[in-house]
């Protein structure tokens, strides 16, 4: 009986560890500063290569928009929106470009209280600043 209970606990623990996150963070960076609180997130770095994500939540009445500010000196970064383990490309930021936009989200995100913003490099990125607000 003890062995059966031990095996069940082990299987349950393994299942919980494997199903915790839907999106993976894997990167190398120098001077990386991140913040994620409620419906706002930001990331600033000197150099960055890899993938990072932020979980944004909104409360109350929704405008279904994403305020987005970004600048990048060198490299190329894809910005995705993720829901339920799937991701959709919002835009690509290339070196020398900067954005200050409000993006109206598709109808399929109307009922979503939580979204993920996924930042994924194509090339090594230098001197980047990204800010998001989910409304």
Question: What residues fall within each predicted segment?
Answer:
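Edge beta-strands of jelly-roll/beta-sandwich modules across compartments, strongly enriched
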Residues: 120-135
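C-terminal motif of bacterial Sec signal peptides marking the signal peptidase cleavage site
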Residues: 15-19
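Short proline/glycine-enriched turn/loop motifs at strand-loop junctions of beta-rich domains
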Residues: 61, 71-76, 123-125
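Exposed aromatic-hydrophobic patches
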Residues: 55-56, 100-107
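Extended extracellular/luminal ectodomain segments enriched in beta-structured repeat modules
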Residues: 59-66, 110-112
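Transition segment at domain starts
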Residues: 21-57
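Positively charged n-region of N-terminal signal peptides that target proteins for export
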Residues: 1-8
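Short, surface-exposed beta-strand/strand-loop-strand elements in extracellular ectodomains
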Residues: 74-91, 132-134
């Amino acid at each position: 009986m003890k062995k059966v209970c031990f095996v069940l606990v082990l299987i349950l623990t393994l299942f919980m560890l494997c199903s915790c996150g839907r999106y993976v963070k894997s990167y190398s960076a120098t001077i990386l500063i991140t913040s994620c609180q409620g419906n706002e997130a930001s990331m600033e770095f000197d150099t960055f290569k890899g993938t990072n994500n932020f979980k944004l939540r909104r409360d109350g009445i929704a405008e279904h928009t994403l305020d987005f500010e970004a600048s990048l000196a060198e490299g190329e970064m894809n910005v995705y929106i993720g829901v339920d383990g799937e991701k959709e490309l919002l835009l690509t930021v290339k070196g020398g470009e900067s954005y200050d936009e409000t993006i109206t989200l598709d109808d399929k995100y109307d009922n979503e209280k939580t979204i993920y913003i996924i930042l994924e490099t194509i090339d090594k990125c230098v001197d980047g600043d990204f800010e998001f607000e989910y409304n």
